[in-house]
A protein has these predicted regions:
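Extended, hydrophobic alpha-helical segments
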Residues: 1-42
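Short amphipathic alpha-helical surface micro-motifs
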Residues: 14-18, 43-49, 70-73
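A broad, low-specificity signal for short, low-complexity segments enriched in glycine/proline
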Residues: 22-28, 50-53, 68-71
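Short, intrinsically disordered low-complexity segments
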Residues: 35-59
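C-terminal structural segments of small proteins and small subunits
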Residues: 53-91
Length: 91
């Protein structure tokens, strides 16, 4: 399954941990957004890992957007063709 994952984490340290966890499962696209092609069990493993890293009571959030094959082919992009390599951006 193809999943776009975005996150909003206020704490720099937790944000870095979320970034590292996601980097093991997908491609970093921009700041707090990853694209992942995962099997169902990989998704459950990632979701469990992220659930243990975030602090929802401190307004941390992670969103998962599931794209079907047809929808995936309709993704359009303007600019930003270079894929990011590594490293978290802290704003």
């Amino acid at each position: 399954m193809f999943i776009v994952i975005s996150y909003d984490i206020k704490d720099d340290r937790r944000r870095g941990r979320i970034f590292k966890a996601l980097k093991n499962f997908g491609q970093w696209m921009q700041y707090s957004v990853f694209e992942c092609e995962l099997e169902k069990m990989q998704f459950f493993k990632l979701k469990d890992r992220l659930d243990h890293l975030i602090e929802a009571d401190k307004d941390d959030s992670v969103r998962f957007y599931f794209l079907c094959e047809s929808c995936k082919r309709q993704v359009e992009r303007i600019g930003g063709e270079k894929q990011r390599k590594e490293g978290a951006v802290i704003v």
